[in-house]
Design a protein with these regions (language model features):
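N-terminal maturation segment of proteins
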Residues: 1-299
Length: 299
């Protein structure tokens, strides 16, 4: 935790600055959030348009992810809507990950057709990576097919930093795959999002410097979210304390490991991490046979 505290404020500032610089390069006359919303983060007009785009983005993500990780030939990721009773439970849908113990290679992504106006082209591009290819679905499949103890194939909270860190890493690793020059802007905005999550976790729960109401305002002012969305995000902080650290902290830990293994090719590195099982991200050091002390071990 001391390691995260050291960098959390600087990370948020640098993420915001990078997002603003990228938006300014596209259109220096407008607010960065407005640039985002007018280019890559435009709402869909119909559910059908949303579903068709998601299928297309999944195909693109699969083709390009295979450059970074070995994928089973028979992998299938279907796109479906949510059931009516799920529409309020999953406002943005969910990833239907396969059962690793059954060695399944079929997975799915459910999009909330009742809330289609909340989706944009850029958000679906990001979901196709984060939830599927170089993200959660392929992670669960790789774990299921790996030659590791069965106990390592049982999902658990201890594996969350590795799982979310890998999926978040994929967003930046594959940000150029769609041939859309504005998608990296959404990826930069997403980085602000995960950095703000860390900032709120630390200042709301560790230091007690901000209230939930303050956190809602931060999500609205920094991210451009409406009040309802911001309140939902803060509610997630309150219901699952600590989880929102997993995305960015996990990603940064993975990159620290990567920096120690520059002679290792990317595909071998990715295959190793995706097939390690649902283990503590600290134990990844043993899997990769890294002898040096990591930054979080020095605090």
């Amino acid at each position: 935790m001391k390691w995260i505290v050291k960098w959390h404020e600087k990370e948020l500032r640098s993420s915001i600055d990078r997002f603003k610089e990228m938006a300014c390069a596209i259109d220096p006359t407008r607010d960065p959030i407005e640039v985002l919303k007018s280019t890559i983060h435009v709402s869909y007009s119909t559910p059908e348009e949303m579903f068709n785009d998601m299928k297309k983005f999944l195909e693109i993500a699969r083709d390009h992810a295979s450059k970074y990780i070995d994928l089973p030939q028979d992998i299938v990721c279907e796109v479906t809507g949510v059931r009516e009773f799920e529409k309020d439970i999953y406002p943005m849908g969910y990833a239907g990950v396969p059962d690793p113990l059954e060695k399944e290679t079929k997975c799915m992504i459910a999009l909330n057709q009742y809330n289609y106006r909340a989706f944009s082209r850029g958000w679906l591009m990001m979901m196709a990576i984060h939830e599927a290819y170089y993200g959660h679905n392929i992670h669960w499949i790789k774990v299921g097919l790996a030659d590791i103890p069965e106990s390592f194939k049982i999902p658990s909270d201890i594996g969350s930093p590795l799982a979310e860190g890998l999926a978040h890493r994929g967003e930046e690793l594959l940000q150029d795959i769609y041939g859309d020059k504005s998608f990296p802007l959404l990826v930069a905005w997403r980085r602000v999002h995960t950095a703000l999550r860390v900032y709120i976790e630390i200042n709301m729960f560790l230091y007690n410097k901000i209230t939930p109401e303050d956190a809602v305002k931060l999500y609205m002012n920094i991210m451009g979210f409406d009040e309802q969305t911001a309140k939902g995000l803060v509610e997630a902080h309150l219901e699952n304390r600590g989880y929102n650290l997993c995305y960015l902290a996990g990603y940064k830990m993975i990159e620290e490991y990567r920096s120690k293994l520059r002679d290792l090719d990317e595909k071998t590195f990715s295959n190793t991490l995706f097939s390690a099982g649902f283990i503590s991200i600290r134990n990844v050091k043993k899997v990769l046979d890294i002898k040096e002390d990591m930054p979080w071990e020095k605090d």
